[in-house]
Amino acid sequence: MSSKNKLMLILGAVLGVLYLLMFRYQLINAQFHELGGLALFALVLVHIFMNRKRITSFISNFHNKPLKARAQIIVDAVFGFSMLTIIGTGVAMAHTLPVNLGAHSDVLITTHTVASFVGLAMMGV
């Protein structure tokens, strides 16, 4: 196994554990939840950067791909959209970080939570 593959495996494991840990909001404090969310965002960007060639080749010629490959692309896109939603609403609602936008409403909380569970479901597909 190459060093890049080992790094990707470790990164994937860290991303998965951190994502699941964020669901236990009641057991961790708000600051850890918010910092963990920002770390998750940074690690997702690293993951995308490290896989950019694979992602590009996977997406190219979408309509010529077999049905299973197209379904996987759609699942990945839904997961990506849920991550963007989680990050956007999380930053908007943050209250323990210097990035305090002060947006805290039931709609944002619900959107953040639903997007989190949609992302979790997409991870399982």
Spell out what each predicted region is.
Residues 1-125:
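Membrane-embedded alpha-helical bundles that constitute the cytochrome b-like, heme-associated redox core
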